[in-house]
Amino acid sequence: MSRVGTWLKMLVAGTVICVGGPAFVQSIRPTDEELFKRYNPDLQKRSLEEGDRRAREFDEYVTRLKQWSKSDKSIWFAAQEQQEQKRAELDAQQSRSKDEARIQREEMRKELLGEK
């Protein structure tokens, strides 16, 4: 067989593989509706209930990613800084609540000692 024939066969085979493969996969992949219909009724109900919440969480995540990408720093460093900031706020809140509880205990102790 000539070289031109070999090249043509390879081009046709490559085209069939490159175009036909993804087309075949797309044709056998179930749609979201078909997958949803395969769920049992409990999963369908739970999926419908949690859909809005998950959509909101995803929107919040995308918003945070946009904020992080505006920074000159890497997204990973910006995310890490935000986590550290949240952790510091949580620690401060916990220490405030511990201080309030300690002050309340001291006041209660003073009241008890003062009444005796």
From Swiss-Prot:
Entry superkingdom: Eukaryota
Name under which the protein is recorded: Assembly factor cbp4
Ranges in a coiled coil: 77-116
Xref: PANTHER family: ASSEMBLY FACTOR CBP4
Homology family: Belongs to the CBP4 family.
Summary of the function given for this chain in its UniProt record: Essential for the assembly of ubiquinol-cytochrome c reductase. It has a direct effect on the correct occurrence of the Rieske protein, core 4, core 5 and apocytochrome b.
GO cellular component, one term: mitochondrial inner membrane
Region named Disordered: 86-116
Membrane topology note: Single-pass membrane protein
Cell location: Mitochondrion inner membrane
Name of the gene this protein is made from: cbp4
Main location per the UniProt record: mitochondrion
UniProt keyword Cell cycle, yes or no: no
Keywords: Chaperone, Coiled coil, Membrane, Mitochondrion, Mitochondrion inner membrane, Transmembrane, Transmembrane helix
Keyword Transmembrane helix: yes
GO biological process: mitochondrial respiratory chain complex III assembly
Organism: Aspergillus clavatus (strain ATCC 1007 / CBS 513.65 / DSM 816 / NCTC 3887 / NRRL 1 / QM 1276 / 107)
